[in-house]
């Protein structure tokens, strides 16, 4: 296959694999040699073993390296316009930890609450704002004031529905943060109020019905 023809084909894909190329070229070993030649020429990039792209914009391929996966946290808040911060790193929730250039993959057991958006003609999996709030609380990777601002711009009923899917400790933290933002998750509180255990969280607030205590003291 001629280089020009090859590049025109893979430009339509966010990510392509050695297996895909070998199906086209008809020889797995030759495909590996062919792809290595393309890398040396600077025409394609290796993302991880067996995965390649021709694109420079990481958002195009960020959610196509691991499945399932979706963009969340800072980048999601920026997408929804709830923060003025411009994130340098794209944080992706998936089933394992890892990093590549300006992407960080964060392990999560809760890979739901996201949807498909279009970016430069490609599919990208983006967190719902409500799930981004939950991810921000449970990972403790976003300042509380930023999370509270997102809470003020979300669907509270949907946030409560999502929160009810979480474990008791996470429910307490989320309920606590939502109340700081001026709202109250009644169903969540009814679920957790009989649990007498305290949970540690990155807050300076003391004494609250959610049994959340600061881990800074």
Language model region names:
Residues 118-217:
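Hydrophobic alpha-helical interaction segments
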Residues 38, 45-48, 106-111, 150:
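Short, compositionally biased low-complexity segments
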Residues 54-57, 108-119, 153-158:
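Short amphipathic alpha-helical segments and their helix-coil junctions
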Residues 1-71, 155:
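Short beta-edge/loop segments at beta->alpha junctions of small alpha/beta modules
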């Amino acid at each position: 296959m001629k280089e020009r023809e090859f590049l025109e084909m893979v430009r339509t894909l966010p990510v392509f694999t050695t297996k895909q190329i070998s199906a086209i070229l008809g020889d797995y070993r030759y495909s590996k040699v062919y792809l290595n030649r393309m890398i040396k020429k600077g025409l394609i990039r290796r993302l991880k073993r067996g995965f390649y792209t021709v694109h420079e914009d990481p958002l195009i391929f960020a959610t196509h390296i691991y499945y399932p996966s979706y963009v969340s946290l800072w980048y999601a808040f920026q997408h929804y316009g709830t923060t003025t911060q411009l994130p340098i790193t794209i944080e992706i929730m998936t089933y394992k930890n890892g990093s590549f250039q300006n992407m960080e993959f964060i392990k999560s057991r809760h890979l739901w609450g996201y949807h498909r958006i279009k970016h430069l003609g490609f599919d990208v999996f983006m967190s719902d704002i409500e799930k981004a709030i939950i991810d921000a609380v449970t990972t403790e990777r976003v300042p509380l004031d930023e999370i509270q601002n997102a809470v003020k711009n979300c669907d509270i009923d949907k946030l409560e529905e999502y929160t009810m899917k979480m474990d008791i400790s996470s429910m307490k933290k989320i309920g606590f943060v939502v109340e700081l933002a001026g709202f109250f998750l009644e169903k969540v509180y009814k679920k957790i109020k009989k649990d007498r255990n305290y949970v540690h969280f990155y807050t300076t607030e003391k004494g609250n019905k959610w049994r959340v205590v600061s881990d800074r003291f």
